[in-house]
Amino acid sequence: GSPSSNFVAAAALAARVCGLDCDLLVSGNRALLPADVPLTLGLAGGCGANLCFTGADREELDGLVDEHADRLRAEGRRPYPVPRGGATPVGALGFAAAVPELAAQLAGLDDAVVVVPTGSGASLAGFLAGRAAAGATWRTYGVSVSRPAPRIRAEILALAGRCAALLHGPAVRDADLNLVDAVGPGFGRLTDADLRHVRLALDSEGILVDPTYGAKALTAVLDLVAAGERAPIVLWHGGGVPAALTLLAGGAA
């Protein structure tokens, strides 16, 4: 993933718990990062992960992961290659498994709106598969933070369908997904409105919102309210506390 990827840190933590070695292929060059590396990478390194800076763009990482796995096999090891963001049907199951908890919290609120940030598409795909399995009727808005919405939509729906098949649940329909294009100035780059909303969440509710996913999803929520949405809105917080702390530290400096 990228240096600010939530998945980079999560993968390192999971590997440590499972007693697995973890090689993380990171886009970009280490020399171009600030002296204090993003906390996401610091957390991953602190968990014992091997950080491999590729010098490549994010879009090239999946191919590089496969090449790295081939080299490990040639050394007699048994790698389990995972694409960026954990975007596989198995990777999406985590979000699908979380839907029943949300359903319990939203009992009686069938008209609720759920807003989920998405990068690789795995989280949103899992949510859609879990929503279908639960028979929920909430309207779902995905907020695409890294890829143009028309491009990522088909990938999300295909991944959701494959995840639904693993659950032996009903199919995910195209109409189940409303997708907001929030790439803006780029992945992890915020508009002035996004920055204001980060501060608003912190000052009014004490909520840390990261710059990569949460800030853009929060902007989408406030846009819905401004457009007249009156149903209960749930913002699914995508994590990213290390990146949020990095952003706040930079603002303080």
For the regions a protein language model found, what residue spans apply to each?
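Glycine-rich phosphate/pyrophosphate-binding loop at beta-loop-alpha junctions
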Residues: 92-177, 240-253
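Alpha-helix C-terminal capping segments
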Residues: 9-21, 128-135, 220-228
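Short glycine/serine/threonine-rich phosphate/pyrophosphate-binding segments
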Residues: 4-11, 120-127, 214-220, 243-244
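Active-site-adjacent helical/loop segments in soluble small-molecule enzymes
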Residues: 173-230
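A short, small-residue-rich loop immediately preceding and capping a beta-strand
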Residues: 1-12, 18-27, 111-120, 143
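Active-site-proximal loop->helix
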Residues: 9-56, 150-162
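Small/polar-residue-rich loop-to-helix segments that shape phosphate-bearing ligand pockets
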Residues: 29-107, 178-191, 196-197
